[in-house]
Amino acid sequence: GEGGLWSADGWTWNRGAVRPGRGAAPDVLTLGDRYLVAYSTTGGGLGGTHKGTVVTMWNKTLDPNSPDFKYTEPVVVAESADDEDCDAIDAGLLLDPTTGRLWCSYGTYFGFIRLVELDPKTGKRMEGNEALNVAIDCEATDLLYRNGWYYLLGTHGTCCDGVNSTYNIV
């Protein structure tokens, strides 16, 4: 569809979310009084292309009915080419509570999961930051910090097949 659901509290869901740039698989962080949104566009793997892009952009609100609702121009933070061993999709964001550093994981089961550092003030990739391969054979990763430990969660299996889906969290 053209949009989706949005929630201010993670429990109450509202219809009418705007999907900027027709992107997919977004992740959102609140940084100060703004929201940093990361999403991806892709050519699709599985016989298609591995050409993908992860972008970030800012908004003051996630409520599409607010007069303050306006995304900034998207900034590319990761890309993948047709013959690459990673598909730049499925961004996951983490603001490290111990250091204030901002991280973005991305990738799909067609190759590696990669990690890059972003500037928490701009949402841009830190200059000179090389992508680090951190996992393989999973997708839709997210990063968590709990009680002194860092976790990389991902999904493994097949999706989008109703009751025949085998997706599980690893």
Roles of regions detected by a PLM:
Residues G1-V170:
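Carbohydrate-active catalytic/glycan-binding domains of CAZyme proteins
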